[in-house]
């Protein structure tokens, strides 16, 4: 190679490098976070409330997420932290912020839109083409029938709250009647304890329901003594699920080490997609399945479905199904009517860029929660 040719090649390489660097710099600047905004919303009939977080970049690209609640003070702190940072830094969110999960969803939404790819592809998926779903019902009978007609093949049943400790046979008969309403519909069920039972009552219920093969017994009692939870797990083959009220990932690790967790349930409104994936990775090393908890709106549903499509140990996803038609219509108007539609027990994955939904901000304003 002649000296002239070498110089020309070096010059060409430097020009190309400068062009690539300029393009990367421009793209990074376009993804710099400029503004965060809160939209507290509430379903008109049930009163279920959550907070939508919109994150905008300097180029005008917007992403959306959800959290349970955030104050103006929380928003100001998040604005100070995120302003000027690139949307690609979603994994660095401060875990103690109430907005952490929502901002995580919103930033992944932005990165997906900028990349023209669904979020699950950014996360290495899809691991499946659809996600199994269940919904919680209040009471039995008509509520279970409504869920089945809506396409669900699994429901969550709230355990009857005992009037006192050690209810004995009468309580077991009441529980049996509740479960029979689901079995008569040929549906699977999750028994939701919601931490209402004492450890003794929880152990008794766990032993009683194992014959009916529940998907799992959710929050059978409060998370206190790991030895007590281990005893409940050892005395019944009914799988145990925890996570609805857990706010620190280390608690999942403690439960896994103690051998008293069969279904990990990180709250996607708190942990977001990234935090939930970290917990799922930890659970996978113990051969434990993941069924994320979700009590928010349709934006979180979209995030949960992308999460499901990225997890090898995903089990089933909870999706809220309001009893009132007005509430269901509000959710459909907010993010698209097909998003939360379930067919034969499965929800379809959103396939558009980012979270794959178009958020109607007029609906956010209409159902603003004072």
Q: Where are the model-predicted features located?
A:
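Hydrophobic faces of well-ordered beta-strands that scaffold small-molecule active sites
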Residues: 65, 131-136, 155-157, 189-193, ...
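N-terminal export signals
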Residues: 1-26
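Shared catalytic-loop signature of beta/alpha-barrel
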Residues: 73-75, 80-91, 224-346
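Conserved, mostly hydrophobic/aromatic
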Residues: 60, 103, 116, 155, ...
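C-terminal extensions of enzymes
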Residues: 14-18, 329-370
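Metal-dependent enolase-superfamily TIM-barrel catalytic cores that perform enediolate-based chemistry
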Residues: 129-236
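Structured beta-strand/loop patches that form or line metal/cofactor-binding pockets in enzymes
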Residues: 23-64, 68, 73-75, 327-328, ...
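Metal- or metallocofactor-binding catalytic centers and their adjacent structured scaffolds
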Residues: 56-118
């Amino acid at each position: 190679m002649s000296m002239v040719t070498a110089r020309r090649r070096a010059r060409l390489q430097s020009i190309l490098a400068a062009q690539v660097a300029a393009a990367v710099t421009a793209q990074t600047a376009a993804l710099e976070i400029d503004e965060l905004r809160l939209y507290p919303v509430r379903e008109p009939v049930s009163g279920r409330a959550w907070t939508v977080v919109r994150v905008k970049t300097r180029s005008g690209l917007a992403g959306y997420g959800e959290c349970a609640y955030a104050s103006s003070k929380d928003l100001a702190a998040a604005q100070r932290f995120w302003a000027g940072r690139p949307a690609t830094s979603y994994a660095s969110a401060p875990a103690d912020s109430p907005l952490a999960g929502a901002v995580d969803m919103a930033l992944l939404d932005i990165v997906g839109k900028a990349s023209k790819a669904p979020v699950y592809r950014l996360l290495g998926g899809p691991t499946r083409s659809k996600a199994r779903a269940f919904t919680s019902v209040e009471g039995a009978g008509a509520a279970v029938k409504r869920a089945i007609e809506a396409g669900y093949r699994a429901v969550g049943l709230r355990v009857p709250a005992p009037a006192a400790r050690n209810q004995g046979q009468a309580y077991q008969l009441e529980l049996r009647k509740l479960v029979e309403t689901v079995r008569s519909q040929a549906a699977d069920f999750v028994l939701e304890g919601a931490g209402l039972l004492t450890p003794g009552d929880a152990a008794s219920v766990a032993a009683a329901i194992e014959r009916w093969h529940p998907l799992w017994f959710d929050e059978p009692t409060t998370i206190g003594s790991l030895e007590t939870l281990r005893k409940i797990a050892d005395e019944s083959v009914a799988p145990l699920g925890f996570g609805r009220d857990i706010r620190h990932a280390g608690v999942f690790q403690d439960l896994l080490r103690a051998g008293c967790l069969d279904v990990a349930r990180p709250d996607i409104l708190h942990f977001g997609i990234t935090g939930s994936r970290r917990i799922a990775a930890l659970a996978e090393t113990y051969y434990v399945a993941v069924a994320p908890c979700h009590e928010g709106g349709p934006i979180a549903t979209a995030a949960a479905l992308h999460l499901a499509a990225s997890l090898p140990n995903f089990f089933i996803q909870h999706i809220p199904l309001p009893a009132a038609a007005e509430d269901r219509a509000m959710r459909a108007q907010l993010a698209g009517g097909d998003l939360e539609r379930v067919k034969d027990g499965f929800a379809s994955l959103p396939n558009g860029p980012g979270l794959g939904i178009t958020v109607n901000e007029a609906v956010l304003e209409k159902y603003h929660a004072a």
